[in-house]
Amino acid sequence: MGKKKTDKIVFENVKILDAGAKGVSVAKAPDGKVIFLPNVVPGDVVDVQTMKKRKAYYEGKAIKIHEFSEHRIEPVCEHFGACGGCKWQNMKYSQQLFYKNQEVYNNLKRIGKIELPEFEPILGSEKQLFYRNKMEFGFSNARWMTDAEIQSGTEFDNKNALGFHIPRMWDKILDIEKCHLQEDPSNEIRNEIKRFANENNLTFFNARAVEGLLRTLMIRTASTGEIMVLIQFFENDKNGIELMMNFLAERFPQITSLQYVINQKLNDTLYDQDIILFKGRDYILEEMEGLHFSINAKSFYQTNSDQAYELYKITREFAGLTGNETVYDLYTGTGTIAQFVSKKAKKVIGVEAVPEAIIDAKANAERNNITNCEFYVGDMKNVFNDEFINQHGQPDVIITDPPRDGMHKDVVEMLLKTDVPKIVYVSCNSATQARDLALMDEKYKVVRVRPVDMFPQTHHVENVVLLEKR
C-alpha cells in the first residue's frame, strides 16, 4: 500500500524486477506505473520513496531494504551510491553480464525488429576493477557533502574537492579518496595533487563564479607502464602553474608525459585547446600484439586496454580474412583496428573525421612498419561515396565502428550500394546499432552477434555483429 510522506509517496515492500537503462533498476508501483530507482538489485524487496512523478512512471529511491537479492554483493568502494560511476558495483558480476546481454538482445529485437541468430556468449572482462586506462577528475571549491557528513554535524572549513561530478549537479564535486577503476599510481597522484594544492593555497575552480586556478585533471596509463598526466588550469597564473607542475615532476619522476592547458572557456573540453608539454614527450605508448600505438592527450583509445584486445580479436575473427581482401575501416580513429587486422588483409583503408586522429594513425602505421594501410580524413557521409570506392577499390569486407549516435543514413545507404559481401559492425550503443541494422535488413542478414563487456560495474556494453549479403 502507499502512504504519504510530506508531498512524496512511499510504496512499501516493492520487489525490484529488472535492471533498466542507464544503470537504474525497475519495479512496479501498486497503481501499475513503473518505478525507476538507483542503487538496488533485481530481487531486492524495498520501501520506495518517490522523488518525481511522471505521467507513466515514477523516479524513486529505496529508503529501506526488507530482503536482499541473491545477486547482491557488498560494494568495494566507499563512495558507492554518492558517486555516479560504478552503478552496478553492488551486483554480482555474473548477473551484470546477464543484464548487459539482455539489453543488447532487447535492443536488436525491439528496435531493429530483425531476425537474430543465437547470441555467442558475452565476453566478460578478466579485470572487474582497476581496468581503466584513462580517468578525468574535476576540481571544485564546492565539495558535495554526503548524508553521513551532514548528519555528523562536523564543520568542514575546507570545501575543496578533487573527484567526480555528482550526477545532475554541474557545480558540485564528490571528493574521491580512492577510486577502484584505475590502477595506481592514479590514486596517489590525485591525492598528492590535492594535498599540495591545499597546503600551498592554490585555488580550486568555482563553477558558479567562474574563477580559480585548478580546473580538471586527466591521468592516462598504458600496459607498457607509461603514464600521462594533464592538468587544466583556468587562470593564467604563471607562478601557481609552475609550482604545481614542478612538484609533480619531482614527486612522480615515473610520469612519461606531463602536460597542461590554460582553458578559460566556459566548458572544459580539450579538443580546441593548445596543450603545453612541461616534461617528457607529448604521448604515451600502448602495446597490443606486438603493435605500438601512440596516445596523446586528445586521442581516442578504448579505455579498457585488455578488453580492447579481446574486442579487436573478435572483430578480426568475424571479418574472416585470408590475406587477399581489401578492407575498409570506417570511423577508424587512430587506426587501431585497421592496423590490428592488416596482417591478414591485402589492403586496409581507414576513414576518420578527426584530423589529429588520422595524423596519429599514419604515425602509428609508420612506427609499426605497416605498409598496407592508408588513412583518409573527412566527414564520413561526404567522403564515403562512389568516387572514393573508384579510387581505392571495391571492398571485400567493411568494418564500421561509429560513435554512440551510430551511422548517418547516407553512410548506411552507401554501405548498401557497395554490395560488399561482409560487414562487421562494432558498436558502443546497441540501440543505434539496431536502428542501422534494420535499415540494412533487406539486403544483409545478421549471422553472428557477440556482446563484449568493456566496462564492469556499469551498464555499458559493446556489441559486435557480422552481417552477410542475403
What are these model-derived regions, one by one?
Residues I219, G225-F234, H292-N296:
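Short, aliphatic-rich beta-strand segments
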Residues K64-E74, G81-T203:
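Extended interfacial segments that mediate partner engagement and assembly in macromolecular machines
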Residues D171-A207, E211-L213, T221, E235-Q259:
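Internal alpha/beta scaffold segment
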Residues S25-P30, G163-I166, A361:
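Short, acidic/hydrophobic/Gly-rich beta-strand patch recurrent on exposed beta strands
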Residues G43, Q182, N304:
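Short, conserved phosphate/pyrophosphate- and ester-handling motifs at nucleotide-, phospho-/glycolipid
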Residues G2-N13, A21, S25, N236-R470:
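Rossmann-like S-adenosyl-L-methionine
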Residues M1-H79, E374:
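Terminal RNA-binding accessory module
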